[in-house]
A protein has these predicted regions:
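Acetyl-CoA-dependent GNAT
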Residues: 2, 6-68, 72, 85, ...
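Short acidic/polar active-site loop segments enriched in Thr and Asp
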Residues: 62, 95, 118
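Accessory recognition modules or surfaces
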Residues: 78-85, 97, 131-140
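Conserved catalytic-core motifs of GNAT/GCN5-like acyltransferases
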Residues: 98-101, 118-134
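Conserved GNAT acetyl-CoA-binding A-motif
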Residues: 85, 91-103
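Conserved acetyl-CoA-binding loop-helix of GNAT-fold acetyltransferases
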Residues: 71, 77-90, 110, 114
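Active-site acidic-Proline motif in GNAT/NAT acetyltransferases
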Residues: 58, 72-78, 103-104
Length: 141
């Protein structure tokens, strides 16, 4: 059974182990720590093991923004990213929820489109040669 909950400081080490980017990007560890301490990080757990996580903030021009969404490869294609995004939609305190992904990340683009997100813009130069595609969903309250 997969459960969703707020991340706790005790989860930070497991989150670092879960996310391969934390090995190559020195900014990831402080980001995960800050997101956890500010209660913006939510984790998915199965049999006591962290299998995915995401970060929802409200700092994108005062709108909700899913800054990060990650599911371990062994647990992909099981609708867990969908479940996490819907969880964030329910928690979002604004009428619009934004998120983004690299142009190279076709599965994330397909996920956002399937969930009713619309392309809202492009940010160049974050990752060289791989623009960031911004998505928005208007939430009904």
């Amino acid at each position: 059974m997969v459960t969703l909950r707020l991340a706790k400081p005790a989860d930070i080490g497991a989150l670092m182990d879960l996310d391969p980017v934390s090995v190559t990007d020195t900014r990831r560890a402080p980001f995960i720590g800050q997101a956890t301490r500010s209660r913006a990080c939510h984790v998915m757990e199965s049999d006591g093991r962290l299998i995915g996580y995401g970060v929802l903030t409200h700092n994108f021009y005062q709108y909700g923004f899913v800054e990060l969404l990650y599911v371990h490869p062994d647990f992909r294609r099981k609708h867990l990213a969908t479940r996490l995004m819907r969880h964030f939609e329910g928690l979002c305190a604004t009428e619009k929820l934004f998120t983004s992904t690299n142009k190279s990340n076709i599965p994330a683009q397909q996920l956002f489109t399937a969930l009713g997100y619309e392309r809202s813009g492009v940010i160049e130069n974050l990752d060289e040669g791989d623009p960031e595609l911004v998505y928005v969903k208007r939430l009904t309250r």
